[in-house]
């Protein structure tokens, strides 16, 4: 069980048990219930989760498992879009902490159901085979209020907010199978894997407007309480259906060329079919297929260090519209990576460094809003190149002292040398540590961490004003303490964003910004039986 700031409460139970004396039939049941607020005004969330699985060894080397999960999420007081980033003069707005522009009735309710089954068989020669099926069913209902317009001043908006209700869902069937094992050839041991996947998604969505829109006043920003009249959703604005079908066949081969040198190679064939209808009329129908190869080499320099290089093709379907409202095609590209991995202290401490380069073409980048179609459009970049490197150190440096240190640098540019994907930081640094005190205090573990990122920015759109939305570099600090009363009972305190830093966690959506969560604390009691 857990309790924390902002009226946060959570309870979870996890039960596992055999159903017979031999343990050949066993099950697990997990249930969780969460109620929480937020440092953002008005926002609250309820979430209930139930998960169960039964496994049965139906033969000496054959296991069958079936299960499912249900998740119900009820957030309320949410905002459709963030807070306007700039005023009418193009100057950044310094919103008060916790400022929100949702209505008390605005929400995004979701219900998810998952059902799955798998059969796994181990052959006498050491090979394994699996067949699986998963069914996913999702629905959502979201009456929302949108205020990411341009404020005339901090006192009010230039127009009344936009109100819209979204409703929809999707059903997905996923089939999969794989076989893997080892074989001997040329005096060495090798590994092979072969598999397939097939999925079909049928989705639908509707949006509703209200005839009450024109009667609503311009909101008072400074004294916003969320007490906005509940609309009468009486105008069907959009009704669409989508059908996506993806089929893939893949294989990988790991060859032991020498005692120290290994070759990993493989390929995946993907076929993607997508169809959209709007108002009963087919809006688009596309079919793409592609083979994406992969090849990599690893070389054991000694017992501590292993060097590697790898190359893979990229094929990424993009479900977005271009400026002329045609469907964007897939993005294609290549990824190259090289690095060194190390294992110290008998495997308790691991480190790695790597450099990478990703070249892509036909990448969709957000361009603006199309009022005629009531949706966003994207322009297609002729080419982008992302270069960077990353380093990581993780593990136990001394008895009872664990550390994690990770640093990533990446920069993306188009063919003209202009930076793109600027809403993502070029630099990320993560550091965390936990230390279990020695001697009489060995039941207590203390730790903390810091998350730092470099500057991010987004361009404004829609011709409202020119300029950039900028988030300067910032760092977030966290603390934790854990006390073990026994091997089965422990209590833990986590404090996130210790300094209560005010920052944008994302930006650019309809010229808006989303603030990150402020300081929060959570106490968790865990009891095992």
List PLM regions with ranges.
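Outer-membrane beta-barrel translocator/receptor signature
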Residues: 1-52, 58-62, 113, 349
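Membrane-embedded beta-barrel scaffold of Gram-negative outer-membrane proteins
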Residues: 17, 118-134, 138-146, 307, ...
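Acidic/polar loop-and-plug regions of large Gram-negative outer-membrane beta-barrel proteins
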Residues: 34-38, 53-122, 137-170, 214-238, ...
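Structural signature of Gram-negative outer-membrane beta-barrels, strongest in the C-terminal barrel
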Residues: 55-59, 63, 170, 187-201, ...
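Face-selective signature of the C-terminal outer-membrane beta-barrel domain
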Residues: 115-138, 161-278
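Gram-negative outer-membrane beta-barrel transporters
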Residues: 259-260, 357-359, 379-461, 499, ...
């Amino acid at each position: 069980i857990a309790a924390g700031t902002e009226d946060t409460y959570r309870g979870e139970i996890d039960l596992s048990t055999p159903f017979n004396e031999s343990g050949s039939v066993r099950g697990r049941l997990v249930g969780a219930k969460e109620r929480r607020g937020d440092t953002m005004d008005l926002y609250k969330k309820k979430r209930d989760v139930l998960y169960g699985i039964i496994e049965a060894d139906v033969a000496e080397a054959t296991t069958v498992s079936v299960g499912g999960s249900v998740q119900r999420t009820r957030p309320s007081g949410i905002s459709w879009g963030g807070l306007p980033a700039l005023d009418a003069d193009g100057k950044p707005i310094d919103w008060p902490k916790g400022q929100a522009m949702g209505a008390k009735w605005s929400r995004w309710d979701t219900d998810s159901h998952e059902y799955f089954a798998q059969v796994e068989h181990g052959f006498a020669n050491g090979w394994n085979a699996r067949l699986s099926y998963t069914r996913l069913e999702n629905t959502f209902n979201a009456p929302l209020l949108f205020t990411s317009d341009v404020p005339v001043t901090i006192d009010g908006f230039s127009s009344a907010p936009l109100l819209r209700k979204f409703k929809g869902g999707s059903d997905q069937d996923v089939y999969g199978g794989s076989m893997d094992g080892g074989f001997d050839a040329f005096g060495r041991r090798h590994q092979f894997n072969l598999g397939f996947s097939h999925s079909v998604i049928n989705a639908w969505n509707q949006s509703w407007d209200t005839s009450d829109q024109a009667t609503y006043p311009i909101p008072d920003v400074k004294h916003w309480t969320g007490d906005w009249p509940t609309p009468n959703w009486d105008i069907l604005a959009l009704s669409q259906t989508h059908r996506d079908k993806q089929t893939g066949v893949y294989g990988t081969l790991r060859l032991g060329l020498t005692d120290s040198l290994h070759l990993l190679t493989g390929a995946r064939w993907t076929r993607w079919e997508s169809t959209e209808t709007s108002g009963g009329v087919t809006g688009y129908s596309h079919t793409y297929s592609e083979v994406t190869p992969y090849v990599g080499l690893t070389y054991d320099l000694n017992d501590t260090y292993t060097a590697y290089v790898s190359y893979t093709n990229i094929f990424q379907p993009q479900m977005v519209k271009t400026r002329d409202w045609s469907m964007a095609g897939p993005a294609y590209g290549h990824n190259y990576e090289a690095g060194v991995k190390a294992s110290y202290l008998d495997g308790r401490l691991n480190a790695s460094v790597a450099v990478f380069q990703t070249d892509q073409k036909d990448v969709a980048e957000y361009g603006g809003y199309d009022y005629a179609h009531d949706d966003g459009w994207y322009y297609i970049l002729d080419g982008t190149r992302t270069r960077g490197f990353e380093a990581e150190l993780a593990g136990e440096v001394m008895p009872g002292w664990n550390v994690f240190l990770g640093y990533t640098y990446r920069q993306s540019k188009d063919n003209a040398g202009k930076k793109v994907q600027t809403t993502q930081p070029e630099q990320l640094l993560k550091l965390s540590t936990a230390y279990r005190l020695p001697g009489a205090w060995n039941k207590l573990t203390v730790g903390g961490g810091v998350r730092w990122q470099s500057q991010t920015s987004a361009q404004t759109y829609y011709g409202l004003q020119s300029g950039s939305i900028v988030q300067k570099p910032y760092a977030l600090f966290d603390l934790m303490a854990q006390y073990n009363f026994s091997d089965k009972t422990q209590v833990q305190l986590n404090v996130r964003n210790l300094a209560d830093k005010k920052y944008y966690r994302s930006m650019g959506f309809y010229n808006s910004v989303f603030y990150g969560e402020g300081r929060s604390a959570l106490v968790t009691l865990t009891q095992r039986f």
